[in-house]
């Protein structure tokens, strides 16, 4: 929510902000898709859509955790925004969230981690369900401060000691 009110990343739930005409303004890496790979200076990001968000009163769906039940497409406006960014190479703001399983994720909340370019956009098969997903390769723009890095092994050991 703070990223939205601070105008760093407008959507409060969606991981992609932008449109098909100008491209993406920002993305949030928050652990929503198991196919995402975060290497810090570069990462692979999974697109939007393909999730059943209807739910019922007895079994409500969560926007972030609903399972993917259909293929993603580049017709989805958010996926089209990232595809456009791959074409223009206009930098995109990146926010990392604490739920992301990565040494580059903050320990709490969300953090602005700088500008990245979308180097490539393609369709691929999801790792967990065999459905098609939109994939994007991001690369960090040079000349920015180094990313903070967590020691996940030390954090695990400290949690076990408690």
What is each of the regions a protein language model found here?
Residues 1-111:
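Acidic, glycine-rich low-complexity segments with interspersed aromatic residues
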Residues 104-161:
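Compact mixed alphabeta submodule
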